[in-house]
Swiss-Prot record:
An example molecular function term from Gene Ontology annotations: DNA topoisomerase activity
Task performed by this protein: Is essential for plasmid replication. Nicks the positive strand at the plus origin of replication.
Family per record: Belongs to the Gram-positive plasmids replication protein type 2 family.
Ranges of biased composition (kind: Basic residues): 16-26
Name of the protein: Replication protein RepB
Gene source species: Lactiplantibacillus plantarum
Pfam families the record matches: Rep_OBD (PF01719), RepB_C (PF21861)
Amino acid sequence: MKSESKIDWTVPRPNKNPKTKQPYKRGRNWGIVVYPESLPENWKDIIRQEPIAVSPLHDKDVNPDGEKKKSHYHLVLNYKGNKSFEQIDEIARSLRAPAPQRISSLTGAVRYLTHMDNPEKYQYDNADIETFGGFDLESCLALSTGDKRQALRDMLAFISENEIMHLKDFADYCMSEEAPAGWFELLTERNTLFIKEYIKSNWQKQQYASKNINKMSD
């Protein structure tokens, strides 16, 4: 990234998803990462009318090699109607921030503001999340009953499809960055025994099937 002194923040940036190399489509949910040393002094006044949730200052994050990450804030924007990349980029540029990105899971993005589903990362305090513009934080932090039921179905399907035989293996996955939002919470807070028995029954079923195959081959 260019040094801040050489960046013309008035110039619109190209609409390109860095992962797919394709333009972002319009969407309701967007994310922006901002850095304290780049922010204008009145940055909260700039975003005050936008439906935004702001994370606590992430000043204790580390890279996989243990190197400390640059301090930053995560911003989650949730609109009632679709917004274009250009509209959100205008906000990002006013904050002297990198280009915005579309958010696929609003709940996951909001819970990531404090690493709720990433216990291997530093746990920030939900009480330090700030909201503006009528952002409904509580409904985003909590998984709905329907979300929990669907997530549990997805967890059981994952266990079967991947032939998970040990609770530890599944717990390790739930703690990883690849796991969907809420899985670690569902596993540890209310469903551990059920999932443990489900994994055990899968193992027993495979053992039974294996014995039958051996008998038929004798």
